Amino acid sequence: MVKSQNITWHDSEVTKNERQEKNGHKSVVLWFTGLSGSGKSTISVALEKALFERGVRSYRLDGDNIRHGLNNNLGFSPEDRKENIRRIGEVSKLLSDAGLITLTAFISPYREDRDHVREILEDGEFVEVYTKASVAACEERDPKQLYKKVRAGEIKNFTGIDAPYEAPEDPEIIVDTEENSVEEAVEQIIQYLEDQKVI
């Protein structure tokens, strides 16, 4: 629900197409989704570096980082998770309008919320990247010791354990992080971007 009234959208004199032309690549949002520990942040960090080294203008939005500032007033209830993704979707749209390739690393457990972000972007701009890994594999990795805390009863409503995760039905990219290395995942995504003539 929009609460703001008496507001006007101010158009820029620089178009998205002009920005893309200047940058030498198209703008897309690479939306990494998957369980905690599935590799979203690890792969997006490596991909951001690889794109930077190729001269591609990109920016990474990470779930934990965003909750330190923009979304520090949100918890992990279903309503707060929904608002978290709504805000990130709007920020991603702004970065896309700026002509950047945006990398987002968010569990984003609800399909409906990811679909909403797809809808607010232009056709072809939302690229869903499913970092596929089983709960068992993620729990074995447990880079933040979150699964350990869940099992000890210290964390409730944890995605994949006692809160749902709705896996993508038809993502543009599936990265099986149980079978592929970070380097292989980065190569796979860059190949997709080249094949789609984004870069």
UniProtKB/Swiss-Prot annotation:
GO terms for molecular function: adenylylsulfate kinase activity; ATP binding. It catalyses: adenosine 5'-phosphosulfate + ATP = 3'-phosphoadenylyl sulfate + ADP + H(+). GO terms for biological process: hydrogen sulfide biosynthetic process; sulfate assimilation. The keyword Mitochondrion does not apply. CDD domains: APSK. The active site is at S108. InterPro entries: APS_kinase, P-loop_NTPase. Pfam families: APS_kinase (PF01583). Its EC number is 2.7.1.25. Keywords: ATP-binding, Kinase, Nucleotide-binding, Phosphoprotein, Transferase. ATP binds at G34, L35, S36, G37, S38, G39, K40, S41. Pathway: Sulfur metabolism; hydrogen sulfide biosynthesis; sulfite from sulfate: step 2/3. It is an enzyme of class 2 (transferase). Belongs to the APS kinase family. Catalyzes the synthesis of activated sulfate. This is Adenylyl-sulfate kinase. It comes from Staphylococcus carnosus (strain TM300).
